[in-house]
From Swiss-Prot:
Gene3D superfamilies: Methyl-coenzyme M reductase, gamma subunit
Catalytic activity: coenzyme B + methyl-coenzyme M = methane + coenzyme M-coenzyme B heterodisulfide
Record Pfam families: MCR_gamma
Record-given protein name: Methyl-coenzyme M reductase subunit gamma
Length: 249
C-alpha cells in the first residue's frame, strides 16, 4: 500500500484521504456541467471544444509502443487545447491547501499538471478533462464556498482576516454571501467576468465541521507539534538531507 502521508492526527488522516485515489470524496453540493463551464470562463456553454490538433485516431504517427500502454484522456483523444482551474484556500481551516492539492492532484488525475504557490494552486489539463476535474473539486469536500476561492487572477486573500460572514477576502468579489438565504453565490467567473445569472454554491460549512475536515495544522485546532509520528519523519528527512549535503565521511 502506498505511504501517502505520515502522522497519526486527524489532519494527517484528512491529508491521506485527499491523496489516496481509492478514497471516495464526500459530495457536498451539486453543480451543473453548464455552470462549471461558466465558472471556468474558457468557452461559452454549448460551444464546441476548440482543438490544437486533429483527434488522435486521425493522426498518422510513427509506431510507438508507449501509445499502446498508456490510454490517452478524453481531452487528448479529441485534440483539446490545454486550460486550467485555480483555487485559493484560506488559512482559516479551508478543507484543502496548496501543497496537499498538488500531491492529491498528481495521485488522482491523469494528464494533468499542477503548480503550487503560497496561497493558490493551479491545475492544467486538456479542456474537457479540466472541466471534469473542476466539477469534482467544487462539488466535494475539497471545496467550501466561504473558505475556498475559484480565482484565475487577483488571487490574494488566503491569509487575510475573514469578514463578518466568515468569507475569505476577494478583491474581485467573485463569491458573495447572501444574508437572506445563508448561501454563497458566485457572481463572476474565475477571472472576474460578471455572470448574467449567479451560480448557487450552497451553504458554507460551520466552523466545527471545517476544523474536522481541514488539512491545515493550526495552534487553535491541532498543532503540528502534537503529531509525533509526523515530526519524527520530517526530522529524519531533514537530518539525512543536511548530512548528505555536507558529505560527511
Amino acid at each position: 500500500m502506498a505511504q501517502f502521508y505520515p502522522g497519526s492526527t486527524k489532519i494527517a488522516e484528512n491529508r491521506r484521504k485527499f491523496m489516496n485515489p481509492d478514497a471516495e470524496l464526500e459530495k457536498l453540493r451539486e453543480i451543473s456541467d453548464e455552470d462549471v463551464v461558466r465558472i471556468l470562463g474558457h468557452r461559452a456553454p454549448g460551444e464546441e471544444y476548440p482543438s490544437v490538433h486533429p483527434p488522435l485516431e486521425e493522426l498518422d504517427e510513427p509506431e510507438d509502443p508507449i501509445k499502446d500502454i498508456v490510454e490517452p484522456t478524453e481531452g487528448a483523444k479529441a485534440g483539446d487545447r490545454v486550460r486550467y482551474v485555480q483555487f485559493t484556500d484560506s488559512v482559516y481551516f479551508a478543507p484543502a491547501q496548496p501543497y496537499i492539492r498538488s500531491r492529491a492532484y498528481l495521485w488522482r488525475y491523469r494528464g494533468a499538471d499542477a503548480g503550487t504557490l503560497s496561497g493558490r494552486q493551479i491545475i492544467e489539463a486538456r479542456e474537457r478533462d479540466v472541466e471534469k476535474i473542476a466539477k469534482e473539486l467544487i462539488e466535494t469536500e475539497f471545496f467550501d464556498p466561504a473558505r475556498t476561492g475559484i480565482r484565475g487572477k487577483s488571487v490574494h486573500g488566503h491569509s487575510l482576516r475573514l469578514d463578518e460572514n466568515g468569507m475569505m477576502f476577494d478583491m474581485l468579489r467573485r463569491q458573495v454571501y447572501d444574508e437572506e438565504t445563508g448561501r454563497v453565490k458566485m457572481v463572476k467567473n474565475q477571472i472576474g467576468d460578471e455572470f448574467d445569472e449567479p451560480i448557487d454554491l450552497g451553504e458554507p460549512l460551520d466552523e466545527e465541521t471545517l476544523k474536522e475536515k481541514t488539512t491545515i495544522y493550526r495552534i487553535d485546532n491541532i498543532p503540528y507539534r502534537e503529531d509525533k509520528d509526523l515530526l519524527e519523519i520530517v526530522q529524519r528527512i531533514h537530518q539525512l538531507r543536511s548530512e548528505a549535503g555536507f558529505s560527511p565521511e
